[in-house]
Amino acid sequence: MRIKAVFSVMSVVLAVVVAGCGGGSKSGDKASGDKGGAPNSPEVRKLIRETFGPNDKAKSGNISGVIDITVKGLPRYREPIQVSVVGPFSDAGGSPEAMFNVSLGLRGGILGGDMYIKGNDALIGLGSTAYQIPDPIASDLRQPLQGHPGNTLGKVLGVFHIAPERWAKNPRIVGNARIAGIDTIHGTAGIDTKALFLDLAALAKRLTALRITDITGLPREVDRQARQALQRSVKSATGDVYTGADDKVLRKAKFDMLLEPSAKDRRILGGFTSIKVVANLDVTDVGSPQTIKVPSNRGSYSALQVSLDALAEAVK
């Protein structure tokens, strides 16, 4: 069964880009030197600034991410969940634009839809129709685009409350690797889970405004008690990030995280016994011109609500 509908591009990007902040590394890379490999070295701090700070090389490209999620302890999610997000982003002369096609495999069905950020608009695309998001919600969605000056990729990630530079704990450079024909610098770090779950809480509010939480069964909010329980539940988080050696643009991230809450925390978090997340993100065609096309057929926000109501019933 295929249901054409919108799903949370924000949660997809959040989970994938956390990969850039995961701990752990793999052998086989050429060492960058003892100094560069030290945690919190001047070299790695500079690399973080160059990757997520002003960088006119990060003005366009394509994002492709896949997340596999395995939940235990909740019958509603007894089958593995897979989320994918694919789409271009562009500086567009100083006004960041993006289009993400999102697909979610959930309980034997597939949900799919598009999200557009173009000009002053934010839209949701279902099939050949684009639905305008009302100004109050769209303005909040676009507000982070004012940050990350000179880094379009960073601006787009900021829309989804993604800030790896805030989450990195004891970052270090572990080597070099060639990714899709590009020489990259391989970095790793631990995760500041307090900062991570604060951003997750902000993201939940945005998802609720778009009714994503109602449709998917995600929590409408992540309060302080839940954030603390999540922090305590992280058993392992390993990840790797690869940044272009010459242009310092993020090229690839990999992430593997396991949460196993205690019996007490399970009651706070809804009852799951474990969640395993494996994610991969690739950024390609960096610097290549990208065109963001929004369907000419437009639908009203009220019409979108009818479609979302039908979707919510279909996935119960």
Language model segments and positions:
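Bacterial N-terminal signal peptides that target proteins for export
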Residues: 1-10
